[in-house]
Every structure is written in C-alpha cells, then in structure tokens.
C-alpha cells in the first residue's frame, strides 16, 4: 500500500526535473547568423541532488553533465542545432546519454515586431537509466526584448513524452525566464528561472513541481566567444537543490565578410 501511495509522487519528481540539468539555458530570439556555426560546451555539476534511483533513473547527486551543442545558421532566420549529452556519476562512470536535433526559425526583421520572436522544436532520444522519456519532443516559443541595459527573455516551453514506460503523452509546461542587466560594459548579471508545473490538463501540488532560480553571469561584447555561468538553487522537493553551470561557446564564420 505504501508503494502504491508513493508512486504518483515519484512519477512527478522524475517527470518534472526541468531540463534534466543537461542544457540549462534560456534562449534568446535571434537565430545563428547564416554561414556561421557556434560550438558550445554545457558543463553542469549537481552539488546536491537526488541520491536514490527513482523509476530506473540513476541519482543526480554529484553528477557531472557535459553536453556538446553545435548550431549552424542555414538562412538569415533559420538554424539547426544538434546535441550530444554525456554523464559522469560516482559509481557509474562516464556514459553517453543521448542525442537531440533542434531546428529553429525566427521572425524576419522585415516584420518589424516590437519584440524578438522565434520557435524551436527539439527531438531526441536518451537512455532510460537517465530519463523516464526514451524519446521526447520539446516545443519552445522564444520571446525577448532589450531595453537599453535591461534584457528579458521568455521561453514558455512544452515538453512531450513520445516513448516512455512511465509518462503520459500529454504535454508538460516548462516555463523559463531570464532577466539580466548590463551593470558594466561587457558584463551582464541576471536571474534565470526554470520550472516544470506538470501536465497541462491537471494541476500538481507545488512540491511535486520543479522550480529553480539561477544567479547568472554573461560575457558581452565578443563576436567570437560566448560565456555564461551561474549557480542554481532548487526551490521544491522535486528539484535538485544546488547546481553549478558553465556554457562556453566559440563562433566560427564559414564565409568571409567583404
């Protein structure tokens, strides 16, 4: 009887682990420039996370996640990104977790919208010992706006489990928000929020939802390099309590500008 009572809670904890701490990023609306590629390494370490195996998914406590993301601009407003996810967990060693592909399109500048607007669809597979979703689809509208030194980005994301032994195919709402301010010429300091509130057709108790706040730094002013790092605090029982993240990117132009 006790296991039956706990099953919905354990399912919620696994289901609502926002972004699974592999790719912790709030996207801006602009797509990668045509004829250029950015190589990004996402390095995340969970200082205080889940210590038990839950529904076949291995613990996140003291896990190191290294994700390679390669994004190429195809046209002036269309890009394709690919991901390779890896995991190093004490007691389990190094393993490749899975791979994703993510096409994204942005609104043309000719539309003269008051905000930046784009949309991505991310499809991928991952091993069942690292995720309750074997195949998943993420639909991500992206809205952003720059006011002088203040920057705001919204990613009201919907994640769909395509193949899973545990999760429904009903979309899960995962809102992400970034608010940053340019305190110095080449430095943005801000707050990033990552959440997962549950299936769109039913409400979850707050402790079964995932909510995390990251205090983040962004390097500005470089056309060739990208740097973001931050420390995240989990706000509910369903969220890893303390996570550090670093995103390091290098941009390459394949066609020389005249």
PLM features: residue spans?
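Bacterial Sec-dependent N-terminal signal peptides
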Residues: 1-22
